[in-house]
């Protein structure tokens, strides 16, 4: 298995699976089970087009199992696909001992979700955030009812009146709750993350820093780090390799820059300059320092540094509104700017948008698609859902859609849910990660950009 681990670390999932499959006839008991789980994790991470194996060896069997499960839509379809595959391959190691995630899928299919607890604060600093999340969550619930889907019942619990988490879980169990959505408060999510286990599967609506928590805890939020990684992916897909960066002074800016830098450098990109935005009066000088204007001997116009191919920007709309005109003024108007969604106020303020023409930014599908039928329904009732609060409505809708699918996302690591807050997948540490869509300010309007190949 040492060789298999080395191949896996090198990103060669198929070769690692082949190596482990060759070992399986000689293994029994726990060793066989953990080898099966490792093979499943490797083949399940491959895209469907790589799973069309020819032949009847052990590895081909694993690949046909992964393809069968991935091709099925609902939990019940997946169950049928697994049962059918086992009937066709009765002597295969995976038929004799199903990998643990598939055993869990079987359990999930036999326990339909009938009751969800929504644990959110009704008072305090987060009350307005909480209300947007709750309204989005319930909008998705009513939509499921209208579609005749017989959705689970929802029971509300107020986290701003919690005496203790233990007491809450005792009450929820007594009420017959099978899944908790919430809490939102970071300190409560941290407490849950530090526990060895939870009595009920829980989808927290925030992230705790640090290590992986108990097996029953999943975490979902609008992390700025997801957006920083998204910028790195997009710029790389657009063929760029050398970045400058501007982020706000402080802990938030540091976190976002770190996430961008890690994703960017992991794939061979370099960061050639960084400025931390502080006071508006210093901005012009900071932009000048970053683009390093130089006087040219014969030419009357100075030129910017040429080793910087684009600028990664994490900033408020007000800051972005100053930065783009300043770049133009500093003879760096041709420097592409890739930004997080924080530059987009979604206020409809044409003057503000005009100052940002040319900035590309990642954003939730919710705010980029005004014609989405659910968005039209929701904004008719809550007009503020069309503005920057819309991201939270979208997250509430996605929390509802994620609720019954957590086990599937965990069992099938590369599966995705196309949500309103982004395209959602599950990390190995059970955090929901978002990939976003792209737009560019053009003629004072955000215009959708086509997706890239990757």
Segments from the language model and where they lie:
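Short beta-strand elements in bilobed, periplasmic/extracellular small-molecule ligand-binding domains
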Residues: 144-159, 214-218, 265-286
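An alpha-beta-alpha
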Residues: 219-278
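Periplasmic-binding protein-like
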Residues: 173-185, 202-205, 244-248, 297-317, ...
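Extracellular/periplasmic periplasmic-binding protein-like sensory domains
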Residues: 307-308, 324-397
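Segments of small-molecule ligand-sensing domains
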Residues: 380-448
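Short beta-strand elements at the ligand-binding edges of bilobed clamshell
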Residues: 210-234, 353-365
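Alpha-helical protein-protein interaction scaffolds
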Residues: 1-102
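Beta-alpha junction/loop-to-helix N-cap segments that form part of ligand/metal-binding clefts
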Residues: 129-133, 147-210
């Amino acid at each position: 298995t040492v060789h298999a681990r080395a191949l896996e670390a090198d990103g060669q999932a198929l070769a690692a699976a082949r190596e482990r499959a060759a070992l399986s006839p000689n293994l029994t008991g726990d060793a066989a089970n953990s080898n099966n789980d490792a093979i499943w994790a490797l083949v399940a991470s491959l895209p469907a087009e790589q799973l069309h194996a020819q032949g009847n060896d052990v590895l081909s069997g694993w690949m046909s199992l992964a393809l069968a499960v991935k091709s099925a839509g609902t939990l019940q379809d997946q169950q049928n696909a697994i049962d059918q595959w086992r009937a066709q391959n009765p002597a295969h190691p995976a038929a004799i001992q199903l990998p643990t995630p598939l055993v869990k899928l079987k359990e999930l299919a036999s326990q339909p979700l009938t009751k969800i607890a929504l644990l959110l604060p009704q008072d305090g600093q987060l009350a307005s955030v909480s209300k947007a999340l709750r309204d989005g969550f319930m909008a998705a619930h009513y939509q499921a009812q209208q579609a005749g889907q017989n959705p689970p019942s929802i029971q509300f619990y107020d986290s701003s009146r919690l005496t203790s988490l233990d007491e809450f879980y005792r009450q929820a169990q007594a009420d017959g709750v099978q899944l908790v959505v919430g809490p939102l408060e970071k300190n409560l999510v941290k407490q849950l993350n530090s526990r060895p286990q939870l009595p009920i599967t829980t989808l927290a609506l925030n992230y705790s820093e640090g290590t992986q928590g108990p097996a029953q805890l999943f975490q979902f939020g609008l992390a700025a780090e997801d957006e920083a990684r998204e910028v790195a992916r997009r710029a790389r897909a657009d063929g760029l390799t050398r970045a400058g960066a501007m982020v706000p002074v402080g802990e938030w800016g540091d976190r976002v820059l770190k996430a961008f830098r890690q994703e960017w450098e992991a794939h061979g990109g370099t960061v050639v300059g960084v400025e931390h935005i502080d006071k508006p009066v210093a901005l012009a000088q900071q932009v000048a320092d970053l683009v390093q204007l130089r006087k040219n001997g014969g030419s009357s116009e100075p030129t910017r540094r040429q080793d910087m191919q684009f600028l990664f920007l994490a900033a408020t709309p007000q800051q972005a509104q100053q930065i783009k005109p300043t770049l133009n003024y500093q003879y760096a108007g041709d420097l592409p700017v890739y930004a997080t969604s924080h530059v987009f106020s979604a206020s409809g303020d044409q003057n503000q948008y005009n100052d940002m023409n040319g900035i590309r930014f990642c954003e939730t599908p919710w705010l980029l698609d005004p014609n989405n039928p659910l968005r039209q329904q929701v904004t008719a009732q809550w007009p503020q859902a069309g503005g920057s609060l819309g991201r939270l409505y979208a997250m509430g809708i996605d929390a509802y859609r994620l609720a019954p699918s957590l086990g599937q996302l965990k069992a099938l690591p590369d599966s995705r849910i196309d949500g309103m807050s982004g395209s959602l997948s599950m990390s190995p540490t059970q955090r929901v990660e978002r990939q976003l869509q792209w737009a560019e300010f053009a003629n004072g309007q955000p215009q959708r950009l086509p997706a890239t190949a990757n």
